[in-house]
């Protein structure tokens, strides 16, 4: 039998993309609740073994939660929802399963159901940091910034070592034009998870906003070291180089962005300015 709760929210990662354009928050359908995909085939093996566990222990809520997470890794969101539903039917106080189901609903663009599940998770456990974080991301995407900010404050209070809540709160401060507080939050996110690219990119955007172009170049390069196929990262690097007056590197960076995403607006506008 799988241990109770099996470490809470399993694989549905509240991954926040950096802003799509400088000073803007990603639209509601962009990187709302990403699931780590499994290219190794391990999830299929896990699903089979977890199905055996469930057959032997049909009232094991943690096994349903774990298999639901494996389904989500494979992009099988309806199967994931079904398993998370079984988990909360067996254990109505299983906050992590409500959060996981909410994240699966977000992938299915069923935001009303997702919001209801985040709320229910907090009824089950008012101190569940992941539920505050997940609800904040949804509220942020819907433009409800004060409510999202309040949820992120709670998430950080409950889990001060979590990088994602600092990153998410930094994006809200950035949207509000408070780049000083945004940079502080991005610093905290990077301190806690130095291998995530999005906080570097977001901090680079805030550095541009406050005129620290050398620091912005460093941050966009750091983001691109994590993901060199990030068109927005190349476009942001182009803006930073352009602000420095380095025309050649700006053109090169904008060109790299266009080669990845020919419709990247920041890069297209940058190339138009420099032609």
What is each stretch, according to the model?
Residues 8-17:
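Bacterial N-terminal signal peptides
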Residues 2, 16-66, 70-78, 82-85, ...:
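N-terminal leader/linker segments that initiate helical-solenoid repeat arrays
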Residues 61-62, 95-96, 129-130, 145, ...:
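Helix-start (N-cap) detector for alpha-helical repeat units in TPR-like alpha-solenoids
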Residues 40-49, 75-86, 107-120, 142-154, ...:
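Structural signature of tandem alpha-helical TPR/SEL1-like repeats
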Residues 21-34, 41, 231-275:
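Terminal, low-structured helical/coil segments at or just beyond the last alpha-helical repeat
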């Amino acid at each position: 039998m799988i241990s109770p709760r099996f470490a809470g929210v399993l694989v549905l990662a509240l991954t926040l993309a950096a802003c799509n354009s400088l000073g803007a928050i990603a639209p509601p359908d962009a990187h709302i609740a990403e699931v780590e995909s499994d290219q190794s085939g391990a999830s299929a093996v896990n699903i089979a073994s977890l199905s055996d566990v469930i057959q032997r222990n049909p009232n094991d809520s943690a096994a349903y939660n774990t298999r639901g997470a494996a389904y989500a890794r494979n992009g099988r969101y309806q199967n994931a929802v079904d398993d998370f539903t079984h988990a909360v039917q067996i254990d109505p106080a299983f906050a992590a399963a409500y959060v996981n189901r909410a994240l699966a609903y977000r992938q299915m663009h069923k935001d009303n159901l997702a919001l209801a599940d985040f709320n229910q998770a907090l009824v089950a456990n008012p101190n569940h940091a992941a539920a505050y974080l997940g609800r904040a991301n949804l509220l942020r995407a819907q433009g409800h910034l004060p409510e999202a900010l309040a949820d992120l404050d709670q998430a950080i209070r409950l889990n001060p070592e979590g990088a994602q809540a600092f990153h998410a709160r930094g994006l809200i401060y950035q949207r509000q034009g408070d780049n000083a507080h945004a940079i502080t939050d991005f610093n905290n996110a990077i301190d806690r998870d130095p291998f995530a690219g999005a906080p570097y990119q977001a901090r680079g955007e805030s550095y541009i906003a406050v005129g620290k172009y050398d620091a912005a170049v460093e941050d966009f390069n750091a983001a691109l070291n994590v993901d060199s196929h990030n068109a927005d990262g190349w476009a942001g690097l182009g803006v930073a180089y352009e602000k420095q007056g380095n025309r050649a590197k700006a053109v090169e960076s904008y060109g790299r962005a266009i080669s990845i995403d020919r419709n990247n607006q920041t890069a297209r506008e940058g190339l138009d300015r420099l032609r």
